């Protein structure tokens, strides 16, 4: 019988990140006149488990590119690899000579973009599990009134969630793990990213 290969989590911060999108549950929207759908983009560093999340009104490829730049600005460095599923935000469904906008953005930043095999969400397990935690910790209690309110509440939740101790990190928080990895020199290979100018330093 087939046995999946054991997955080895990167030990270096920025070596690999997982990126995914989830729907914001409609029932969280307290404004009955608002018919918009909202989407949460999420990226997680595999080594530190630090995340960045941001809400959008669509999940197009151009939105994915915008999120990529926001994420790099948030983390302050360029990751080596970003792994996604094969959603339309990140890849074309059919083979084509055209380069996807998300691939172009990754190429410009020097990031390797890897996609998982179709119908294998477990291969993006860390970001998938983080979404389940979001449902329990955030969306289960969330009521927002407009897009700006959603963004503000999501921003506060992100700060809180990055400061919760995690068993895989020996009960360190993602923020503490980031500082630990920096102190051990396990980030020296990363290219820093200037948040003000949008340039690689």
Cite the ranges covered by each PLM segment:
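Mobile-element integrase/transposase regions
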Residues: 1-44, 50, 66, 74-75, ...
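Mobile genetic element proteins and their domesticated derivatives, centered on retroelements
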Residues: 20, 43, 49, 68, ...
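Active-site beta-loop-alpha junctions of metal-dependent nucleic acid enzymes
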Residues: 36-37, 53-77, 81
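Short small-residue beta-strand/loop micro-motif enriched in glycine and branched aliphatics
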Residues: 49-54, 114-116, 140
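RNase H-like polynucleotidyl transferase catalytic core
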Residues: 84, 103-126, 142-145
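Charged helix-capping and loop-helix junction motifs
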Residues: 96-101
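Acidic/histidine-rich, metal-coordinating catalytic segments
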Residues: 59, 77-94, 117-119, 171-174
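C-terminal domain-tail junction helix/linker
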Residues: 2-8, 15, 109-111, 133-201
């Amino acid at each position: 019988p087939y046995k999946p290969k054991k997955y080895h989590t990167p030990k270096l911060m920025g070596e690999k990140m997982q990126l995914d999108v989830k729907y914001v549950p409609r029932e969280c929207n307290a404004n009955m006149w608002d018919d918009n759908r909202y989407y949460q983009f999420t990226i997680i560093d595999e080594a530190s488990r630090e995340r960045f999340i941001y809400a959008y009104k669509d999940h197009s490829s151009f939105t994915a590119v915008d999120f990529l730049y926001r994420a790099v600005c948030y983390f302050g460095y360029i990751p080596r690899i970003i792994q996604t599923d094969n959603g339309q935000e990140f890849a074309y469904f059919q083979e084509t000579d055209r380069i996807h906008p998300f691939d172009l953005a990754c190429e410009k930043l020097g990031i390797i973009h890897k996609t998982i095999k179709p119908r294998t969400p477990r291969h993006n397990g860390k970001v998938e599990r983080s979404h389940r935690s979001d449902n329990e910790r955030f969306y289960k209690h969330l009521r927002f009134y407009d897009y700006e309110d959603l963004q503000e509440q999501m921003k506060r939740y992100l700060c809180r969630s990055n400061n919760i101790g995690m068993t895989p990190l020996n009960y360190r928080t993602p923020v503490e793990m980031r500082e630990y990895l920096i102190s051990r020199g396990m980030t020296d290979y990363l290219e820093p990213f200037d948040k003000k100018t949008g340039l690689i330093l």
